[in-house]
Swiss-Prot record:
Binding residues for Zn(2+): 385, 389, 408
Disulfide bonds: 760-767, 797-833
This protein's encoding gene: ANPEP
Low complexity bias: start-end ranges: 44-61
Protein name: Aminopeptidase N
Length: 965
């Protein structure tokens, strides 16, 4: 699954833009927030419980000794196959509810004698069979025991069938159920999505099963290791199209008794996990092609989006990416077709359902007239991510969610390889450094981080499972796999990977199985020699949290490692069998020339002539940041690197010019180097035109903005940045002939975006005038947008920040009319840039109304408002006032809660804010925090670290910016 909370290159820069002109006292307001008018009458999303016969067990009556009161399924039964028929109703019934009806037959084998059948079920209302919620029969000559009673256990989400005698080991049985569920708009399980086609509201039925919501669609053994085959049949309105993981067995046939309905039966799936199931009923249309291996490729979307060719780019890159992965894995694509569909309402970024991949519209659709280059990059990388899963995750699947990083980290790494193959001139692989490596280090430097592989007993509940879908699993997983591939070499890595996939096809694995096959590849060749086994090296990166800071003393050649912590005074309570020491691959250059590779072999320190520098020499480690660690040097070597950057920066690779900035700012945050050293590392940027170093500076200085944009430091800081950015702003003004052309190179395009956003956000008059002029031109002729798609996020934000209600209302109206979600995203984020409190307050209230802000966009809208210095306190008050409602509407397992908490607390740096955060935690213990539980603990830790850092550095930073303005 792609990350659900996506920020494009341009939109990410809005974090710098928001609140630029608002360093004034913020007026506290008492706000009455509009309440959402729930289409389903706020009945929750559960259908009524069965009226007679069975019982419903609540949390207050649980007996923990009973297996149905535990979150993990017993291993007494294993499913073989399912036959599932579902009928979604796309108009509301007399009670105003959208529902679906269904029936299911699950065939399973008894592995150990048991007198109870425990199967997952969530928010389903069952039709009784002879007074029970299910019917049981034996297969062949097997006699099934009689059912004693049935019950629904709400807390653990089970349908429990108690038997009068035991099932026999080795025997096969079938259990039948008939049920009804709500086709809610909650983005989970079998749900409905709505969109407008002109003035007509359209409704479709779609799915999102990962991680624990297949059970909301039909009763099933809903764990990844409980693989089975599936026969899916959909009964649907005859004028709509039905899709599922497999192709239809044949044409749809009329439904008996109602000629307005059709029946579509699909081919049997391969053995697969429940979370990869998908089925959709809609009037969507497609564009299609056939890959060289006869795999049918189709891109589905709203009919107008298809007619406008918004799916063509996705179609054009899908075939090459599928071919790339088939070669990369040395394994053919396992299915006869590859459908991909863009959904108007979707909680995640995308989902790798086998053969029917679902996407947010902004991750699949592209319009060259209104989409930016970063939108295009988003499409190709997300497609590559999801198609990578068709083998790694779908064909071979994790045994349990505690190893989620193996699925998502791997896909997050190879997405860059697949996208690079489809777009070879873009240098996409380099973007992993800012997008993943350094972004995740900010979280992994906290004592509240967690290892990649979390102990299985810590991951049981749906909320705990959802917590695993975090930046550690995705970005740290990708970073350490990239490091592994680098020190093995890509060819050797691919050999081990192919062996792993071929050995465990249609099975479940743990990370240890991958290490074993990579080790076999190492042992079958002679050129690559490792200091220890693959497992011994990698266990230190996967079984303990965090990462090392490598410190080099070039006077003595001493090299040492230490667990890097954002707050060095914090206490690490999670023990590590490796004592937070790593086996570290070290690459280095001396005076720009490569040196031989070196391993720091799990010891705290060592000494080597590689790292000893003469008076005129400088040494730099971690070339192209292929290792997952940061580097510190003695003061003299830092000065030599700074001098090199000022005089002949080309002797340092571009990625390492960015690394010098990232590492030094992180080290300064952790009190390991003076903050002035980090700031001095930005002086060379006045002559730098490359994207990566500037992105490192923009990203690193954003922390300074968050800490100081409510203080007297911010004015001198803006003056410094205005002076630094002016040369690159003028460079791109000239290169693009006064912003009328687009730079040819993708990285130059991103550098141009950075230049304009940094210039405008720090008050460069030429940039502010550019934004105002372009936006006014658009307002004067709304049918013709003169702003290049690459620049729209920046121009929209700055124009709205400079303007008032007229500009805001114009942008809001354009948002309502936007036909492409990429354009809507830009406008929705820019609306948070206003400096008018009442407009921000009104905008916040819109997030509670899904008719104004879609549920999938509510979290990112609130966090955009919180990024604005004026909106931050409003957003925080809003979250505190509405936490219970938000939690009930989105559910404790929503991926959005961690992003929400992170977004509204990023600026916290005072004792008062810490007190408020602690009170928020205490006051909502009864409601809970769901998938945001760890994020809340991390917010508390970050706030404490921020308080200490500001106290220590405020005066020093103020004086530095004054001296360099």
């Amino acid at each position: 699954m792609a990350k659900g909370f996506y920020i494009s290159k341009a939109l990410g820069i809005l974090a710098i833009l928001l609140g630029v002109a608002a360093v004034a006292t913020i007026i506290a307001l008492s706000v009455v927030y509009a309440q959402e008018k729930n289409k389903n009458a706020e009945r929750g999303t559960a259908a009524p419980t069965s009226p007679t016969g069975p019982t419903t067990t609540s949390a207050t009556t649980l007996d923990q000794s009973k297996p149905w009161n535990r979150y993990r399924l017993p291993t007494t039964l294993l499913p073989d196959s399912y036959r599932v028929t579902l009928r979604p109703y796309l108009t509301p019934n007399n009670n105003g509810l959208y529902i679906f009806t269904g029936s299911s037959t699950v065939r399973f084998t008894c592995k150990e004698p048991t007198d109870v059948i425990i199967i997952h079920s969530k928010k389903l209302n069952y039709t009784q069979h002879s007074g029970h919620l299910a019917a049981l029969k034996g297969v062949g000559d097997t006699q099934a025991p009689e059912i004693d009673r049935t019950e629904l256990v709400l807390l653990t989400e089970y349908l429990v069938v108690h038997l009068k005698s035991s099932l026999e080991a080795g025997k096969t049985y079938e259990m039948e159920t008939t049920f009804q569920g709500e086709l809610a708009d909650d983005l989970a399980g079998f749900y409905r999505s709505e969109y407008m086609d002109g003035n007509v509201k359209k409704v479709l039925a779609t799915t999102q099963m990962q991680s624990t919501d297949a059970r909301k669609s039909f009763p099933c053994f809903d764990e990844p290791a409980m693989k089975a085959t599936f026969n899916i049949t959909l009964i649907h309105p005859k004028d709509l199209t039905a899709l599922s993981n497999m192709p239809p067995k044949g044409p749809s046939v009329p439904f008996d008794g109602d000629s307005n309905w059709s029946v579509t039966e699909f081919e049997t799936t391969p053995v697969m996990s429940t979370y990869l199931l998908a089925y959709i009923v809609s009037e969507f249309t497609s564009v299609e092609s056939v890959a060289p291996n006869d795999v049918q490729i189709r891109i589905w979307a709203r009919p107008k989006a298809t007619a406008d060719n918004h799916g063509l780019y996705a179609l054009n890159v899908t075939g090459p990416i599928l071919n790339f992965f088939a070669n990369h894995y040395n394994t053919a694509y396992p299915l006869p077709k590859s459908d991909q569909i863009a959904l108007p309402d979707f909680n995640a970024g995308a989902m790798e359902n086998w053969g029917l991949v679902t996407y947010r519209e902004n991750a699949l659709l592209y319009d060259p007239q209104s989409s930016s280059s970063s939108n295009k990059e988003r499409v190709v990388t997300v497609i590559a991510h999801e198609l990578a899963h068709q083998w790694f995750g779908n064909l071979v699947t994790l045994a349990w969610w505690n190893d989620l990083w193996l699925n998502e980290g791997f896909a997050s790494y190879v997405e860059y390889l697949g996208a690079d193959y489809a777009e070879p001139t873009w240098n996409l692989k380099d973007l992993m450094v800012p997008n993943d490596v350094y972004s995740v280090m900010a979280v992994d430097a906290l004592v509240t981080s967690h290892p990649l592989t979390t102990p299985a007993n810590e991951v049981n509940t749906p909320a705990q499972i959802s917590e695993m879908f975090d930046t550690i699993s995705y970005s740290k997983g990708a970073s350490v796999i990239r490091m592994l591939s680098n020190f093995l070499t890509e060819d050797l890595f691919k050999k081990g990977l192919a062996s792993y996939l071929q050995t465990f096809a249609y099975q479940n694995t743990t990370y240890l199985n991958l290490w074993e096959h990579l080790q076999m590849a190492v042992e079958n060749q002679l050129s690559i020699r490792l200091p220890d086994t693959v497992s011994a090296i990698m266990d230190r990166w996967t079984l303990q949290m965090g990462f090392p800071v490598i410190t080099v003393d070039t006077n003595t050649g001493t090299i040492s490692q230490k667990h890097f912590l954002l707050d060095p005074n914090s206490t690490v309570t999670r023990p590590s069998q490796f004592n937070y020491l790593w086996i570290v691959p070290i690459s280095s250059i001396r005076n720009g020339q490569p040196q031989e590779h070196y391993w720091l072999r799990g010891e705290e320190r060592n000494q080597n002539e590689l790292f000893k520098a003469a008076a005129d020499d400088w040494v730099l480690l971690n070339i192209n940041v292929t290792g997952y660690y940061q580097v510190n040097y003695d003061e003299n070597n830092w000065k030599k690197i700074q001098n090199q950057l000022m005089s002949r920066r080309e002797n340092i690779p571009v990625i390492n010019r960015a690394q010098v900035i990232y590492d030094s700012f992180n080290l300064a945050s952790a009190h390991m180097v003076p903050v002035t050293l980090a700031l001095n590392n930005t002086l060379f940027l006045k002559n730098e035109m490359e994207y990566m170093p500037w992105q490192a500076a923009v990203s690193s200085l954003n922390y300074f903005k968050l800490m100081f944009d409510r203080t007297e430091v911010y004015g001198p800081m803006q003056n410094y940045l205005k002076n630094q950015v002016e040369p690159i702003f003028l460079y791109f003004e000239n290169l693009t002939k006064n912003w009328t052309e687009i730079p040819e190179n993708l990285m130059d395009q991103y550098s141009e975006i950075n230049a304009i956003s940094t210039a405008c956000s720090n008050g460069l008059p030429k940039c502010e005038e550019l934004a105002k002029t372009l936006f006014n031109q658009w307002m004067n002729n709304p049918n013709v947008n003169p702003i290049d798609p690459n620049l729209r996020s920046t121009i929209y934000c700055n124009a709205i920040a400079q303007g008032g209600q007229e500009e805001w209302d114009f942008a809001w109206n354009q948002l309502q009319q936007a036909e492409l979600v990429n354009e809507a995203d830009k406008l929705r984020s820019a609306l948070a840039c206003t400096n008018h409190v009442w407009l921000l307050n009104r905008y916040l209230s819109y997030t509670l109304n899904p008719d104004l802000i879609r549920k999938q966009d509510a979290t990112s809208t609130i966090t955009s408002i919180a990024s604005n210095v004026i909106g931050q306190s409003l957003a925080w008050d809003f979250i505190r006032s509405n936490w219970k409602k938000l939690f009930e509407d989105y559910g404790g397992g929503s991926f959005s809660f961690s992003n929400l908490i992170q977004g509204v607390t990023r600026r916290f740096s005072t004792e008062f804010e810490l007190q408020q955060l602690e009170e928020f935690k205490e006051n909502n213990m009864d409601v809970g925090f769901g998938s945001g539980t760890r994020a809340l603990e991390q917010a508390l830790e970050k706030t404490k670290a921020n308080i200490n850092w500001v106290k220590e550095n405020k005066e020093v930073v103020l004086n530095w910016f004054k001296d360099h303005s």
